[in-house]
From Swiss-Prot:
Keyword terms, alphabetized: Amino-acid biosynthesis, Aromatic amino acid biosynthesis, Glycosyltransferase, Magnesium, Metal-binding, Transferase, Tryptophan biosynthesis
UniProt lineage: Bacteria, Pseudomonadati, Pseudomonadota, Gammaproteobacteria, Alteromonadales
UniProt-listed Enzyme Commission number(s): 2.4.2.18
SUPFAM superfamilies, per database record: Nucleoside phosphorylase/phosphoribosyltransferase catalytic domain, Nucleoside phosphorylase/phosphoribosyltransferase N-terminal domain
UniProt keyword Magnesium, yes or no: yes
Protein name: Anthranilate phosphoribosyltransferase
Subunit architecture: Homodimer.
Broad EC category: transferase
Organism from which the protein derives: Shewanella oneidensis (strain ATCC 700550 / JCM 31522 / CIP 106686 / LMG 19005 / NCIMB 14063 / MR-1)
Binding site residues for Mg(2+) 1: 100, 233
GO MF: anthranilate phosphoribosyltransferase activity; magnesium ion binding
Length: 347
């Protein structure tokens, strides 16, 4: 479609009406092909934001992004077990340690297949990719090498800009608007590995159930969409609102640290810093030398991932498995193995 042919779709939007999934996919296909005027793009994104994006519209935008992504060669040996992503939208306004990224190493060391889709920082000083770079992990490794890492090590990291080149066309508009748009929730939905399982944190409690419905529409098998007392993670400092997708149904409930078998901590205990500082904290956690608050925050998130993958019968049992895995040092060994294997792409 050209910019001229999408005008009828824009007219629907500007009248305050909702688009279908297919119509939204058409609009976003034009955008990521670089064929949409920046003024038109800004108007489209703001029209969606002001009315409030529907499940169909978010799903359609994700469809377009997934279709245009660089393909990821899913290893056949992982298909029977299934793959999980542990990811957050970012944008929660807190500068915490890298909980979900560290949890990915723990879950993988405990037996889960983890394909983590990540980017540079959104709201904190250190996003998942910022952290990984500190350990010498090559973010631009080929899809084939990433697939090998997933098969051999149970873990790979997929750097979003490496797979979704078309997103660059929206960057100037997003920077000019300086407000959240649909793009702020799209990142976790467009993992090129298309994981069967998702632990997805969102920056607002209002997004928990809608994003669970989007995952349902996109065909995700099992998922927990969470918002933890202000964080886009499972919370150690308070309650966590959950929408769990299981057997095609969505169940809503709350979890507290007690449900995981760990004590509550204050949010200030989870404060992070620059990538180098956060890397040191991650290293300490994975070596089994982290402080209790840091270790528990990572374990409860890894525990939920292990529960979703079917490696534990409950989030409490998953947390116990995560804690015991940390003590073995296997997660720290995995960190070094991934750095070594990823460096092959630089040779």
């Amino acid at each position: 479609m050209s910019e001229t042919s999408i005008q009828p779709l824009l007219d629907i939007l500007f009248q305050g009406k909702a688009l279908t999934r297919e119509q939204t996919a058409s609009l976003f296909s034009v955008l990521i092909q670089g064929e949409m005027n920046e003024t038109v793009m800004a108007g489209m994104l703001m029209a969606l934001k002001i009315r409030g994006e529907t499940i169909e519209e978010i799903s359609g935008a994700a469809d377009a992004m997934r279709a245009a992504a660089k393909p990821f060669p899913y290893p056949e040996s992982s298909r029977s077990q299934g793959v999980i992503d542990i990811v957050g939208t970012g944008g929660d306004g807190f500068n915490t340690i890298n909980i979900s990224t560290t949890a990915a190493f723990v879950a993988a060391a405990a037996g889960a297949k983890v394909a983590k889709h990540g980017n540079r920082s959104v709201s904190s000083k250190s996003g998942s990719s910022d952290l990984l770079a500190q350990f010498g992990i090559d973010l631009t490794m080929s899809p084939e090498l990433a697939s090998h890492c997933l098969e051999a090590l149970n873990l790979c990291f997929l750097f979003a800009p490496h797979y979704h080149g078309g997103v660059k066309h929206a960057v100037p508009v997003r920077q000019t608007l300086k407000t959240r748009t649909l793009f702020n929730v799209l990142g976790p939905l467009i993992n090129p590995a298309r994981p069967e399982f998702m632990l997805l944190g969102v920056y607002s409690a209002e997004l928990v159930t809608p994003i669970a419905r989007v995952l349902q529409a996109l065909g995700t098998q099992r998922a927990m969409v969470v918002h933890g007392s202000g964080l886009d993670e499972v919370a150690l400092h308070g309650s966590t609102q959950v929408a769990e997708l299981k057997d095609g149904e969505i169940i809503e409930y709350q979890l507290t640290p007690a449900d995981f078998g760990v004590p509550q901590a204050h949010i200030s205990e989870l404060e992070g810093g620059e990538p180098a500082h956060n890397a040191l904290i991650t290293q300490q956690i994975l070596q089994g030398h982290g402080c209790d608050a840091h270790t528990h925050a990572v374990a409860i998130n890894a525990g939920c991932a292990l529960y979703l993958c079917g490696l534990s019968e409950s989030v409490k049992m998953g947390t116990a498995l995560a804690l015991s895995t940390i003590k073995t040092g296997k997660a720290y060994e995995l960190l070094h193995k991934l750095a070594t294997v990823s460096s092959q792409s630089q040779e």
